[in-house]
A protein has these predicted regions:
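Short, flexible active-site-proximal loops enriched in glycine and acidic residues
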Residues: 13-25
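Alpha-helical packing segments of well-folded alpha/beta enzyme cores
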Residues: 5-6, 47, 89, 194
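Extended hydrophobic packing segments that form well-structured cores
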Residues: 265-298
Length: 298
């Protein structure tokens, strides 16, 4: 947060957009993907249609749960049933919307390697853009096995807190897309190092951005100044939330995002509005349990 703020302050102090401080724009706009919602396939298809009608060229959803969350934000996740539903979701989306739209799947590290490999072999025919977090992130060596067994593009990195965990997967070419989280790895400064490092291995970056307007602006600034960009995560159109807190946000149109040609990150923060806002406890993403009662990854 401090690093990103310092880049914004520097840009505003010399009246330059942050993306120009990072090396200058190499593109006018950044292709982006939204979060397609739906706990079941009919709801997912409805959400997918809405996003396609709005102009998005990419869709992203995660490994489908097998039960809705209860009042305590808990749910049962059956890996075998989830794999079946996820494969079916691809089949239905391709049947209805064809292959002009790109699909990204986030496994959320919920499957063991054997199930991941089985699922990916079934998904090959539906040509996903990438499979994200197909294995737990503690042991990058697992990507050696997945690389041998899976032909689909792999994405990983959102859980890594600095450039060092990226070393092995970049140097050994174990992933196709680096999911750098600017708010975890150390801001724009560290993310820029990882981006340039990945470029030497022809690995594109897909910045992780499930957060708010400042994170989105920082990610898009990096993408506008970097050549090796796959796609940018953008959960929803900028400007749909936090409009009073952030009266100026980045731009979006027809599936693309970009930072305006203004000093700093391109966002304005309303301090007076922040002081008036009550702080609400954040809701967790939910707790998942296997059918036998054991805890599993969210």
């Amino acid at each position: 947060a401090i690093d990103i703020a310092l880049w914004d302050i520097k840009g505003k102090s010399i009246e330059k957009p942050v993306y120009k401080l990072l090396g200058g724009p190499v593109r006018d706009k950044v292709i982006s993907y939204p979060h397609v919602q739906g706990m079941n396939i009919p709801d997912l298809l409805e959400s997918a249609k809405k996003h396609i009608d709005d102009g998005w060229k990419f869709l992203r959803w995660h490994q489908l749960e097998t039960e809705p969350f209860d009042k305590n934000n808990n749910a049962t996740f059956d890996p075998l049933k989830s794999v079946e539903k996820t494969i079916e979701s691809f089949e239905e989306v391709r049947k209805i919307f064809g292959y002009d739209v790109q699909i990204c799947l986030d496994v959320h590290t919920r499957l063991n390697p054997a199930l991941t490999i089985e699922m990916c072999k079934e998904l090959e025919q539906y040509k996903p853009f990438f499979i994200e977090d197909p294995a737990r992130s503690e042991n990058p060596n697992i990507y050696r096995l997945l690389r041998k067994k899976i032909s689909l593009p792999l994405a990983a990195g959102e859980q890594w807190g600095s450039k060092w965990p990226f070393r092995q997967v970049i140097e050994e070419d174990l992933i196709d897309y680096a999911r750098i989280d600017l708010c975890i790895v150390g801001g724009l400064t560290e993310a820029l190092k990882i981006t340039h490092w990945a470029e030497t291995h022809y690995i594109d970056i897909v910045p992780h951005n499930p957060l708010g307007p400042v994170s989105a602006a920082a990610c898009v600034s990096l993408c506008m100044a970097s050549t090796n960009i796959g796609v940018q995560e953008m959960p929803r159109k900028p400007g749909l939330i936090d409009n009073k807190l952030f009266p100026k946000q980045i731009e979006w149109d027809d599936g693309y995002s970009w930072c305006p040609d203004v000093p700093g990150l391109g966002v304005d923060f309303n301090i007076e509005e922040a002081e008036r806002c009550a702080i609400k406890p954040s809701r967790s993403g939910g707790n998942l349990y296997r059918p036998d009662g054991s805890f599993t990854n969210w």
